[in-house]
Amino acid sequence: GVEGFRAIVVECLACAEYAVEQLNAIGVAAWRNPYAITVVLPKPSAVVLDKWQLAVEEDIAHIMVMPHVDRARIDRIVADIAANPV
């Protein structure tokens, strides 16, 4: 019901904030708008783009933190970005 949906949204928002924090910690200038699940970051390497199929517009990419995107997945994306600099 509504409470279950609310819990999913709260977790997505928390994971989006976690993604921003983890990306910032490795020197990536990631950000998101308040109450948004979209994390914006500078365009990563082609290796990362190909592996994770990130959407790109010119020199920026974004990650949509949907319910299937948990902290473990974010950690893997961040590790790949750190291991494959532009």
What do the PLM-derived regions correspond to, one by one?
Residues 3-86:
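Conserved C-terminal alpha-helix-loop-beta "cap" of PLP-dependent enzymes
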